[in-house]
Amino acid sequence: MATPCIQNAFRRKTLPVRIGDLFVGSEHSIKIQSMTTTATTDVDGTVRQICALQEWGCDIVRVTVQGLREVHACEHIKDRLIQQNISIPLVADIHFFPQAAIHVVDCVDKVRINPGNYVDKRNMFTGKIYSDEQYAHSLEHLMNKFSPLVEKCKRLGKAMRIGVNHGSLSERVTQRYGNTIEGMVYSALEYAEVCVAMDYHDVIFSMKSSNPKVMVAAYRSLAYELDQREWSYPLHLGVTEAGSGTAGIVKSAVGIGTLLSEGLGDTIRCSLTGSPINEIPICIDLLKQTTELSERWGEADNPFAIHSSKQLGTRNTLNTPPWGNVYGLLINLTDVQLLTAEPIELLQCLGIDTTTGKIDPTTPEGVVVPKAMRSSPIVSEIEKHLLVFNKEDAPILNPMNEEEWLSEETLSAPFVYFEVTDIHTARRFFSLRQHSTQPVCLSFSLDPHLSKNEAIIDLSARLGALLLDGLGSCVLLDFVDIKLSRTLGFLILQSANIRSVTVEYVSCPGCGRTLFDLLAVSQRIRERTQHLPGGLKIAVMGCIVNGPGEMADADFGYVGSKPGMIDLYVKHKCVKSCIPIENAEEELVQLLKEHGVWKEPE
């Protein structure tokens, strides 16, 4: 494969796909999408939520369609929207029931299917082995079952999204390719081949995962495979089951922001637990941060970055005792902060409780201070707990001065700071220095005029894109809000699978299939378990339709099985079923104890 063009982004050229009254594709603006959380059969409630979503700036809305009752409800929903002159496209979300797709396409503008469960049964981890003959027979069966929907969509001029989800691949695909990025890509391509063979091209693809690293790699790989075949289909971007609050925003921004910066993506959704209304401002801010990249497209040898870190340079940590060989987080402290802050207050902002001696898991490894302040009493106090670096200890490289990057003085320093103003310049820096093993501290400044969400999105997109490719040795954050800086720093490191210092939560955004108050339960479980050690991943999923599969890499799962009942999972195995919801949280704690990961809060 040729070395990709990684320093410049061009919007990947894609076909225009009509969805109702709007078009999706590279010649059109990137659209924002969401999904209702009401029961689809609640026509009044669903219509109200759709209208509210449009008022907030949503361009496309999706509803769940489990069966024929929901199909009939969609007919009424669409009629109601037309009567109210609401033109937002309506999308039907289909799982396990092809007949629902065939019927509902009459009244909606697009259908979304999951290749993992549209024709084949989902993977039940039985260990079944498919022979080549059985595999070929399954592909023929796929063609026979899927082609009626393709034919009807083509005849009616309706669009389709082929939405692959990591963890819900079919048994057949998983047996041959594993629950891998390769499996995700081939799952999509099998369905794409049917569409192409039938000359149907109103198709959009998505490759979602709750893990941004997997998600980004899957989209890059699919885009490459599609373009190799000259299939210029649009992409819908999203990190599925991103969770709630700041952590959910960070995950979404790391994944979606990285791909937008590479010119990939024609529609986006931030799948946050709670009201879908809350997703829209985050999407708007995310697109605003990438406006320049999102509004232009062009040709390049390879306009998105399919590459390994070896093509860009190796990642060497500073390896400073007692830091050790980890990707560290440093906080920049200005002379103003050091001169005006109360010592106890500043230490608390850094995560250090001087009364109890307790160190927060999100305490940075060190701070960077002006050399003139090194001997001050407040810095001496900080040095009792953290590493302290003089700002003048290493060169601070100008992102616009390429000669400086490779100068003898620069290369002879023990490490360097590189100020990251944009992703593409940083990638060029690492590309030009790909043979250097010199540690690089990625330095980020945040505009103090940004809102909190804007700051979260800006840093997550810029830093996350580099971390996902394994670039840099540590991170230096310079932001007036020290506590926010360290919280964000570790959340981004965790989202990029670099470090895990706190419990990670996977939770779906909710939809018409959700069987309990997802946001309230998620918050209660978080409150009961957030003191547990980092590296643990807990999933809270609204239903069993996709919950068990889409929480693919979670250690423990809390999944709605039927109204008022919860199933508990260890990895992908259900170990306790049909637990009354009022007992389920205590049963989850007991399960954590049985597996030796529980400890009592201090």
Swiss-Prot record:
What pathway is this protein said to act in by its record?
Isoprenoid biosynthesis; isopentenyl diphosphate biosynthesis via DXP pathway; isopentenyl diphosphate from 1-deoxy-D-xylulose 5-phosphate: step 5/6
Identify the Gene3D superfamilies for this entry.
Dihydropteroate synthase-like, Sulfite Reductase Hemoprotein, domain 1
Q: Kindly list the positions annotated as binding [4Fe-4S] cluster.
A: 508, 511, 543, 550
Disulfide cysteine pairs (residue numbers): none
Picking any one GO biological process from the record gives:
isopentenyl diphosphate biosynthetic process, methylerythritol 4-phosphate pathway
UniProt keywords (A-Z) are: 4Fe-4S, Iron, Iron-sulfur, Isoprene biosynthesis, Metal-binding, Oxidoreductase
Q: Does the keyword Nucleus apply?
A: no
- What Enzyme Commission number does this protein have? 1.17.7.3
Listed under catalytic activity are:
(2E)-4-hydroxy-3-methylbut-2-enyl diphosphate + oxidized [flavodoxin] + H2O + 2 H(+) = 2-C-methyl-D-erythritol 2,4-cyclic diphosphate + reduced [flavodoxin]
Instruction: Show the InterPro entries listed in the entry.
Output: Dihydropteroate_synth-like_sf (IPR011005), IspG_atypical (IPR017178), IspG_bac-typ (IPR004588), NO2/SO3_Rdtase_4Fe4S_sf (IPR045854)
Its required cofactor(s), as named, are: [4Fe-4S] cluster
Q: How is the cofactor bound?
A: Binds 1 [4Fe-4S] cluster.
State any single GO MF term.
iron ion binding
Tell me yes or no: is Ribosomal protein among this UniProt entry's keywords.
Answer: no
Q: Family per UniProt?
A: Belongs to the IspG family.
What function does the entry list?
Converts 2C-methyl-D-erythritol 2,4-cyclodiphosphate (ME-2,4cPP) into 1-hydroxy-2-methyl-2-(E)-butenyl 4-diphosphate.
Protein name (record): 4-hydroxy-3-methylbut-2-en-1-yl diphosphate synthase (flavodoxin)
| Species in which this protein is naturally found | Chlamydia trachomatis serovar A (strain ATCC VR-571B / DSM 19440 / HAR-13)
Q: Tell me the name of the encoding gene.
A: ispG
